[in-house]
Design a protein with these regions (language model features):
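Active-site beta-loop-alpha junctions enriched in small/polar residues
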Residues: 22-24, 54-56, 83-87, 120-123, ...
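Conserved, mostly hydrophobic/aromatic
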Residues: 19, 51, 64, 80, ...
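Terminal-tail/helix-coil boundary detector
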Residues: 2, 194, 222-254, 258, ...
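Glycine/proline-rich, positively charged
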Residues: 45, 90-187, 198
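Structural preference for beta-strand elements that scaffold enzyme active sites
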Residues: 7, 14-18, 49-50, 77-81, ...
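Aromatic-lined glycan-binding groove of carbohydrate-active enzymes
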Residues: 12, 184-227, 262
Length: 351
């Protein structure tokens, strides 16, 4: 089966499934580094050629760089999306040398001459000054040839507008988006459509909650087995609670049985079918589910399927506000589980 592709810009095409890298950074069980690199080759050979990582995903940029080096025949067809997320404690006092140091470090780690896409985030756009000026330095590095394209992640629509109005050329936005978390729909997607900014969505499988394994199960409570489940359990609570989520899983299971696919693929197909969505990011610690995930390209949700899902989704409370507003509140229950200072440069790098 062929993997759907998406034209982000006239000169840049990606796979509509993106291999996520957060799960390789720790907090999701043991990672066999050698096997993880071999698995990357499996993804690329099967058509998932686009990888997502970040400057602060511990060890992941290096893994991708080692994969590129050890698989020279595959490296030319791979697209790598990394991030620039300055530490919270640095905000308001960031120098050009610090920004360029992080970008140069990503180039070294990934073993490339230029970064395909740098997705930018600033932890406190409203409380700590400088997020537009910092993005303009990324634009300077783009002009200098170190960055091919600039994207953003986890800004709300007002903040994204400030970046665009400030002269930052934004190609993509990475929001959290799923049937349970539809915050991008009210403002972010309409604005992005008007500016030709493409959505590359994460959280599409709720960290593993969108599987048949959870159907009919009692509500789980802390401590959960990994950070993803902790994060997305809060989203389920905001959606309307475990009971309503079970209704959604039941509807998805029925649809999946009809098309001979899993609950996860129903959720994934729903996201891929939304306006302005270029791709969905699926985190993986191994390649064991890759063949199953590719089945998302073998079916379509018909009118009856959409009505069945809408019947449940119409009952939801949904998380409040615009994209990432809840998570940005350090005193709130979403913000309290975030890690804000994971991007310290190596001691030999620039300050």
């Amino acid at each position: 089966m062929s993997v759907e592709r998406f034209q982000v810009t006239p000169d840049y095409e990606i796979s509509r499934l993106i291999k996520g890298g957060w799960h390789l950074a720790g907090g999701h069980g043991d990672v066999d580094r050698g096997q993880a690199i071999k698995d990357m080759a499996v993804f690329v050979e099967k058509g998932i050629t686009t990888f997502d990582c970040a400057d602060h995903y511990t060890g992941v940029e290096e893994m991708i760089g080692d994969f590129r080096e050890s698989h020279p025949s595959l490296a030319p067809v791979v697209q790598v999306h990394t991030k620039f997320v300055p530490d919270y404690e640095k905000l308001g006092n960031i120098k050009r040398e610090y920004i360029e140091g992080i970008i140069d470090r990503s180039i070294r780690r990934l073993k490339v001459e230029r970064l395909d896409l740098v997705q930018y985030y600033w932890w406190d756009p409203d409380g700590k000054p400088g997020f537009v000026d910092t993005a303009l330095i990324l634009r300077d590095l783009q002009v200098a040839g170190k960055i091919a394209r600039i994207g953003v992640t986890n800004f709300n629509t007002r903040q994204l507008r400030m970046l665009v109005d400030g002269g930052v050329p934004i190609a993509t936005n990475q929001p959290q988006y799923s049937p349970v978390d539809r915050r991008p729909e009210s403002k972010m997607i309409p604005y992005s459509q008007s500016k030709n900014i493409v959505q590359l969505c994460y959280g599409t499988l709720l960290g593993g909650f969108f599987t048949g394994d959870w159907l009919g199960k009692p509500e789980p409570f802390e401590p959960l087995v990994n950070r993803s489940l902790t994060k997305y359990k809060l989203i389920i609570e905001d959606f309307g609670g475990w009971g309503l989520f079970q209704q959604l899983l039941q509807a998805m299971k029925k649809i999946g049985d009809k098309h001979d696919v899993t609950v996860a693929l129903v959720a994934l197909r729903w996201v891929l079918d939304q306006p302005n969505v270029g791709a969905a990011i699926v985190g993986a610690t191994s390649a064991r589910h890759v063949d199953e995930n590719l089945k998302v390209f073998t079916f379509a949700l018909d009118a009856d399927d959409k009505r069945a899902l809408d019947a449940v989704l119409s009952q939801c409370q949904s998380p409040e506000g615009d994209c990432y507003d809840l998570e940005r509140d350090k005193k709130g229950r979403h913000g309290q589980i975030m890690r804000y200072n994971q991007n310290a440069l190596e001691t030999h790098a620039l300050p």
